[in-house]
A protein has these predicted regions:
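Double-stranded beta-helix
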Residues: 26-47, 73-126
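Short amphipathic beta-strand/extended segments with alternating polar/hydrophobic composition
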Residues: 1-2, 33-35, 55-57
Length: 126
C-alpha cells in the first residue's frame, strides 16, 4: 500500500527482522516497477531499486514519504513495530494495490474499551 498525504517513520521496536518491499509511484499513483525508491534509514538518505527488500534489525527505522509503496512482514519471527506519522485520515489516506480491508473482521463479544478512529461511526459517536 501507499499513502497520499502521510509521511511515516516505521521503527522495528524488537523481535525479528522487519522486511519491507518498496516501490515508487508513477505519475498516475500506480506502482512503478522501474523507478528508484528514495527513503531515509535512521535519518540517512538512501536510494533503493524498485522491488528491493529493506531489512531492519531491532532499533532501526525507515521514513516513508507519500507515494512510497510498501509491504512489510517479519522474517524468522514476530516483530513489534512502532509508527510515528504526520496527521492524516487513515480511512482515506491508505491506497492499496489490491482491494482489501484495512483491518480483519472481528467478532465482537464484549463492548469496546478503546476505539480506533474507524470505530466511531459504528458506535454512533460522530
Amino acid at each position: 500500500h501507499r499513502h497520499i498525504i502521510k509521511t511515516e517513520d516505521i521503527i522495528n521496536r524488537g523481535g525479528a527482522t522487519l522486511a519491507i518491499e518498496m516501490f515508487e509511484s508513477n505519475a498516475n499513483g500506480e506502482i512503478d516497477l522501474k523507478a528508484p525508491v528514495p527513503v531515509f534509514c535512521d535519518g540517512v538518505a538512501k536510494m533503493f531499486n524498485a522491488g528491493d527488500i529493506l531489512r531492519l534489525a531491532p532499533g532501526e527505522s525507515v521514513t516513508l514519504a507519500p507515494g512510497n509503496w510498501h509491504k512489510f512482514w517479519g522474517e524468522n519471527g514476530d516483530v513489534l513495530i512502532g509508527e510515528v506519522s504526520t496527521v492524516n485520515d487513515d480511512l482515506t489516506d491508505n491506497v492499496f494495490a489490491e482491494p482489501i480491508g484495512r483491518f480483519s473482521e472481528i467478532e465482537e463479544d464484549v463492548d469496546a474499551i478503546h476505539l480506533l478512529v474507524s470505530d466511531y461511526e459504528k458506535w454512533n459517536l460522530l
